[in-house]
Amino acid sequence: MRMAIVHHWFVTRGGGERVAEVFAEMFPEADVFALLTDPEFVPEGISKRGVTSSFLQRIPKATRIHRHLLPLYPLAVEQLDLTPYDLVLTSDSGPMKGVLTRPDAVHVCYCHSPMRYLWDGYHSYLRTMPMLAKIPFALASHYVRTWDYIAAQRVNHFIANSNYVAGRISHYYGRESTVLYPPIDTARGYLADAPEDYYLAAGRLVPYKRTELLIEACNRLGRRLRIVGVGPEIARLRAMAGPTIEFLGALNNHDLWRTYAYARALLFAAEEDFGMVPLESQACGRPVIAYGKGGSLETVRARNSRGQDVEAGEATGVFFYEQTPEAIMEAILAFEATEDEYSPRAIQMHARQFDTAVFVDRMRGILAPWQQGSVVPQEGE
């Protein structure tokens, strides 16, 4: 059986790229495809075998301006020739669910998220755009949104990275999905002897992460906040940061995990589809102070969780329910009032339920019937 692994693009490092990397490790004989590829961001195991990219790769600086190439996505995706493959496994938060396969082939899509800027995040993205860009984006979005819905019907079986995403797949595409949480390298996590006096924020510095709320809260409380990550928001965030805020940039794995391990807690303000960063923090036994919506509801056991009874010794964090500095400040103070009651060992054990080995085992089980017999899956199977 010939197999292809298809990822939306390798233009940054994040949870989606980690999933694609694990897929490549699971299936070393599979060929790898992507819409666009920046060699700097291709995982080592994938770069050794090579990636076949779409014709968009020939556009100068395409990996930097890929969002502006939205009108070309449908054509670029459909020009990738996957007819030789019996099983196509896509890792997608973009347009790759629309690849064309043979009628007798099986297409399984591991969906990190429907495209936010086409669906639930459309108006938020539109508001941030210059006036001259709004009309072209609106016209292109209408066309690509229609295509994206049609493309989703080509998939034989969806796997969602969280219950939250499964709900959005159902709402926007009318498709059922199996839920399989993405892989976390929990073995990298370790327990520090004692935390140091700082809070941590980690991730790409982009608008929806709402890092500015964390900065404002820590400015007003006078708490130390260390920020790991780079992105287009960095200049704006630096401009609003007070003396207790420190920007660490991009860290190597060793330094990143050490920074997790010695933080008092992780601060997380985004409404994420899943969110690997909170689990990486918990793999080091550190609590999470998170926005109580989206994927965080599935990865953090909060003491103040609505509709869920969490004992003090089982808690792994605290939620705030409004994306405001005031709500974050209140959550930080609530955490500090009970900080000594958290069990680093219990927090770490909670994170290990999401380990890479668990993901690989379940993924192999999901794919096994189709690998063995090329049986086209039924919806929700």
Regions found by a protein language model. Name each.
Residues 261-273, 286-287:
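Acidic donor-binding loop of glycosyltransferase active sites
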Residues 127-158, 166:
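Membrane-proximal helix-turn-helix segments that form the acceptor-binding/catalytic region
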Residues 287-292, 297-301:
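Short hydrophobic beta-strand element within catalytic cores of glycosyltransferases
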Residues 26-97:
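Active-site donor-binding segments of glycosyltransferases and PAPS-dependent sulfotransferases
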Residues 234-254:
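Nucleotide-activated donor-binding/catalytic signature segment of Leloir-type glycosyltransferases, i.e.
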Residues 301-325, 334-340:
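Conserved acidic donor-binding segment of nucleotide-sugar-dependent glycosyltransferases
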